[in-house]
């Protein structure tokens, strides 16, 4: 390093020569404005009047001597001066930092500051450099110059943000971020504000649910978007409205389609995680040139003050030209949006549910894939499907899987010969056998139909044959002819005449006198199960009895009961006179006579025994066919 020389100042000679000639002058005031806020005032005309009042001639000579001595002394104390200068700079720096910290503590905290323009940054750097130079030369500055520095005015306090903005939830901040990105894509501001009929004629009649960026911003501030899917739905609605109102060849249609494509691609799950820079680079700005279109419709989001917008039209070839790759991405974005909407609907209507579908994996096993899985899950949620997931464990001692039938949908036989349903039917209809109940169920469908049919026939009982035929025709139409078929089958089983098939079930025998021929046989055993029809049976029987029997037939009618009574008396005497054995197993079997009169077989089944005891008039039998023919 070379020797440091002091700055050459020739003003000392000028002061010495012109001291007596120049009068005293008022110092000038120099004002420097930097950045519009700080003001530095320098006053001086090269000389100060107070300096010349106190200075004399001999002081100039004294000053020269001191200058020579100081030059020698400065060489010796060079390093000391450097240390002193360094120390003063550090003190000033600490003092400046302390003042800045005090002002920062008193000023309100600003959570967000905008970047300063380039011009302001250059001016601040220039101001700091000038200030540093003035401070470094403060000790060596000429004493004739008086420096007056005014304190800069305090910086105006910036209004703090509202409480609502400071208390925004992370969900709202994410939606605001998406909204800013979408508005940045809308370079011409087509979708910035709502559209009225003054801007677009007939817009309110065509579009029933309008949407724009300002409305979406208000909904974000009011926290009306509970999920990102709702935000996407409004964004899609806004673009769809523009494409519905405008023709496909207009710039607004193409801008809406392009914005819809880029917006869904930007708001996809991968873009939200990786960022826009990782998904796709910024698209180049399309070339703009004025063209004239045949349909000068106004924009969906066009301001009122713009009468002509032809200079903002794009070329049709460059506007929204979707290649195959971009078309696939657009479709993928729409599919993801639809999937998000479906997932939200499932979670809203069926919370905590697992809905999915079955598919086979590479190994051939069946898998259940869950559709509404946890959004935070990275992998697809699947569950293996096998017999263990569909059936319970084996019960000890059984070789088959336990299967529990659903009793709510259990189907049983309505009229089986060995179930409780048949017994119930027998208690309700004691005059019908299970086979006959099967016929009625097959004809009328169920128990309600059977009861309805019997109720109708009971209602018209005794009203004449015409009314009964009307009821039979009605039941035939209701059952498609099964009513008559069932009645005919029941008549055939009960050995009834075929001409009585159209009569009701409650009025089994016919009322017509011509229905009974002279040669027909009365089967009392088949009619014994109809106790409520005894009057009709007596009437029919009376018609046959009215005929006067011949003398021999009358004697035969009396001889047969007499013979039976005599046999009964003999059997009773034999039974009473015989001494029973002490051992019941040694009892003798019944004789042929006993078997002939008291029963056909000693070994009767349960059903046969019931038939034997159900009729108290067992011995009242119909006349023999031969005798009836003779009569």
Curated annotation (Swiss-Prot):
Keywords: Bromodomain, Chromatin regulator, Nucleus, Transcription, Transcription regulation. The record marks 199, 252 as: Histone H4K5ac H4K8ac and histone H4K5bu H4K8bu binding. It is found in: Nucleus. GO terms for biological process: chromatin organization; regulation of transcription by RNA polymerase II. Its main location: nucleus. The keyword ATP-binding does not apply. Residues 244-246 are annotated as: Histone H4K5ac H4K8ac and histone H4K5bu H4K8bu binding. Plays a role in chromatin remodeling and regulation of transcription. Acts as a chromatin reader that recognizes and binds acylated histones: binds histones that are acetylated and/or butyrylated. Binds acetylated histones H3 and H4. Binds butyrylated histone H4. The Bromo domain mediates interaction with histones that have acetylated lysine residues at specific positions. Also recognizes and binds histones that are butyrylated. This is Bromodomain-containing protein 9. It comes from Danio rerio. The lineage of its organism: Eukaryota, Metazoa, Chordata, Craniata, Vertebrata.
């Amino acid at each position: 390093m070379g020797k440091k020389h002091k700055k050459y100042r020739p003003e000392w000679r000028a002061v010495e020569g012109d001291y007596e000639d120049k009068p005293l002058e008022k110092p000038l005031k120099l004002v420097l404005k930097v950045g519009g806020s700080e003001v530095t005032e320098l006053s001086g005309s090269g000389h100060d009047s107070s300096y010349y009042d106190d200075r004399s001639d001999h002081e100039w000579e004294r000053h020269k001597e001191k200058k020579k001595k100081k030059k020698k002394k400065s060489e010796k104390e060079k390093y000391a001066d450097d240390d002193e200068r360094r120390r003063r700079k550090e003190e000033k720096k600490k003092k400046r930092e302390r003042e800045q910290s005090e002002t920062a503590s008193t000023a309100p905290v600003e959570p967000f500051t905008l970047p300063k323009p380039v011009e302001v940054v250059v001016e601040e750097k220039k101001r700091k450099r000038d200030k540093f130079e003035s401070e470094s030369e403060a000790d060596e500055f000429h004493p004739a110059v008086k420096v007056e520095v005014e304190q800069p005015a305090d910086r105006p306090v910036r209004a703090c943000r509202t409480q609502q903005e400071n208390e925004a939830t992370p969900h709202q901040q994410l939606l605001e971020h998406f909204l800013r990105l979408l508005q940045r894509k809308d370079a011409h501001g087509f979708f910035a504000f709502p559209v009225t009929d003054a801007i677009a004629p007939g817009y309110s009649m065509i579009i029933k649910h309008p949407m724009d960026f300002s409305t979406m911003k208000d909904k974000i501030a009011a926290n009306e978007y509970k999920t990102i899917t709702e935000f996407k739905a409004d964004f899609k609605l806004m673009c769809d409205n523009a494409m519905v109102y405008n023709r496909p060849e207009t710039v607004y249609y193409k801008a809406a389609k392009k914005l819809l494509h880029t917006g869904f691609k930007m708001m996809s799950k991968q873009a939200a995680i990786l960022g826009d820079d990782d998904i796709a680079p910024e698209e180049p700005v399309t070339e703009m040139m004025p063209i004239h279109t045949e349909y000068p419709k106004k924009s969906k989001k066009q301001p009122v003050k713009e009468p002509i917008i032809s200079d903002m039209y794009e070329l049709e070839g460059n506007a929204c030209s979707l290649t195959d790759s971009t078309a696939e991405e657009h479709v993928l974005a729409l599919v993801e949006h639809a999937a998000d909407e479906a997932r939200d609907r499932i979670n809203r209507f069926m919370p905590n549910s697992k809905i999915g579908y079955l598919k086979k994996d590479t190994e051939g096993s069946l898998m259940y894939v869950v559709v509404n899985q946890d959004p935070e899950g990275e992998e697809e949620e699947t569950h293996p499907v096998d017999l263990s997931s569909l059936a319970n464990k084996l019960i000890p001692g059984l070789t088959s899987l336990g299967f529990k039938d659903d009793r709510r949908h259990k189907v049983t036989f309505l009229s089986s010969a060995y179930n409780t349903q048949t017994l119930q039917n027998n208690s309700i209809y004691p005059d019908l056998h299970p086979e006959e109940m099967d016929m009625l169920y097959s004809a009328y469908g169920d128990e309600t139909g059977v009861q309805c049919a019997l109720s109708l026939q009971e209602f018209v009982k005794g009203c004449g044959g015409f009314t009964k035929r009307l009821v039979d025709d009605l039941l035939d139409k209701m059952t498609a002819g099964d009513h008559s078929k069932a009645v005919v089958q029941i008549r055939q089983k009960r050995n009834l005449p075929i001409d009585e098939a159209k009569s009701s079930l409650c009025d089994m025998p016919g009322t017509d006198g011509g229905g009974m021929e002279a040669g027909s046989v009365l089967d009392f055993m088949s009619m014994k199960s109809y106790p409520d029809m005894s009057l009709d049976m007596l009437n029919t029987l009376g018609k046959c009895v009215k005929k006067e029997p011949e003398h021999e037939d009358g004697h035969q009618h009396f001889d047969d009961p007499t013979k039976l009574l005599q046999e009964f008396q003999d059997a009773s005497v034999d039974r009473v006179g015989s001494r029973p054995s002490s051992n019941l197993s040694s009892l003798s079997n019944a004789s042929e006579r006993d078997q002939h009169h008291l029963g056909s077989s000693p070994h009767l089944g349960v059903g046969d025994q019931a038939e034997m005891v159900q009729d108290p008039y067992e011995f009242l039998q119909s006349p023999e066919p031969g005798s009836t023919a003779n009569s």
